[in-house]
């Protein structure tokens, strides 16, 4: 499986592993961050999260158009930089008012950066196998590539949880899912007597000395800061991804070409007939239908 693969495959796979690790680290704590920091309800959080994911999966369409014009490598590099800025905005502790502006700005940047990165890196992987000596290894190459992606996605939630719990523990607190919502209800003056009694018992379990209002404010602030550190992990992951991409660029530079650029001399271009093109489009539409509805 691994024998005879071009070196560029491993460079691109590792770069993508770093990017996916950062992305899924962010996803693992993002909805919790929204509820803890801003007091959003589950419905409001779901709406924001859904719109963000819709943008993440739609913007690659435009990323592909830009790559056809400017080149895949440039778009991948720009995508990493834009995503890094987005994660950095999430990692900066802020007040509620400026925090919301920065949060929505960060989501826009992450979605745009992912749109430039996602897909274009895969195209370069495919281009590595246009050369006749590697064409038979294309299927196993993408198995390796997506294996690397899944490794990054598998460890990301654990990393996010560990960092968050560690930083919260340094403040002498532990994570309890009910506290952020109850704390916001208390501070907003909307808490019921039963919920306030629950909150007071949770405060006692945290061994917090102080009035309940101070506990609510402190817990929200410290938990939000802990999530900021979690987003910082995503920033570090992207830096590693960029370093791998730049350091080993020579191993896949020859695969950074599109239809408007000169192809390497050893690349054999496959010409599709109109009937073959039609069949592939129909197959894609059927796949879309299955993915969307099932």
Where in this protein do the model-derived segments appear?
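Cytosolic juxtamembrane N-terminal segment immediately preceding the first transmembrane helix
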Residues: 1-16, 20
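Intracellular loop-helix junctions on the cytosolic face of multi-pass helical membrane proteins
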Residues: 1-7, 131-135, 139, 161-294
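C-terminal ends and interior cores of transmembrane alpha-helices
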Residues: 78-100
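Cytoplasmic membrane-interface "Motif A"-like loop-to-helix N-cap segments
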Residues: 68-81, 136
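Short amphipathic helix-loop junctions that connect adjacent transmembrane helices
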Residues: 26-44, 165
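Central cavity-lining transmembrane alpha-helices of secondary-active solute carriers
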Residues: 50-68, 154-156
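Hydrophobic core of transmembrane alpha-helices in multi-pass small-molecule transporters
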Residues: 17, 86, 98-120, 288
């Amino acid at each position: 499986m691994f024998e005879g693969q071009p070196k560029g495959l491993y460079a691109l796979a590792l770069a993508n592993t770093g990017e996916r690790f950062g992305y899924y680290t962010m996803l693992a704590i993002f909805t919790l961050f929204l509820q803890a920091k801003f007091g959003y309800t589950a419905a409001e959080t779901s709406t924001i999260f859904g719109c963000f994911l819709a943008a993440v999966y739609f913007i690659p369409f435009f990323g592909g158009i830009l790559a056809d014009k400017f080149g895949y490598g440039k778009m991948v590099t720009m995508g990493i930089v834009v995503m890094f800025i987005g994660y950095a905005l999430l990692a900066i502790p802020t007040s509620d008012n400026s925090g919301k502006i920065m949060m929505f700005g960060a989501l826009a940047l992450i979605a745009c950066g992912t749109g430039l990165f996602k897909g274009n890196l895969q195209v370069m992987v495919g281009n590595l196998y246009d050369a006749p000596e590697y064409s038979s290894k294309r299927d196993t190459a993408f198995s390796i590539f997506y294996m690397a992606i899944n490794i990054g996605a598998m460890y990301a939630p654990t990393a996010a949880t560990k960092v968050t719990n560690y930083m919260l523990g340094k403040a002498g607190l532990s994570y309890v899912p009910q506290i952020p919502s109850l704390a916001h209800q208390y501070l907003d003056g909307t808490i019921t007597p039963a919920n306030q009694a629950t909150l007071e018992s949770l405060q006692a379990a945290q061994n917090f000395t102080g009035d309940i209002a101070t506990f609510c404010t402190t817990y929200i602030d410290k938990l939000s800061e802990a999530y900021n550190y979690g987003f910082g992990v995503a920033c570090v992951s992207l830096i590693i991804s960029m370093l791998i991409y730049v350091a080993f660029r020579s191993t896949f530079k020859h695969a950074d070409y599109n239809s408007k650029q000169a192809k390497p001399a050893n690349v054999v271009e496959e010409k599709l007939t109109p009937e073959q093109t039609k069949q592939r489009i129909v197959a894609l539409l059927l796949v879309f239908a299955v993915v969307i509805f099932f």
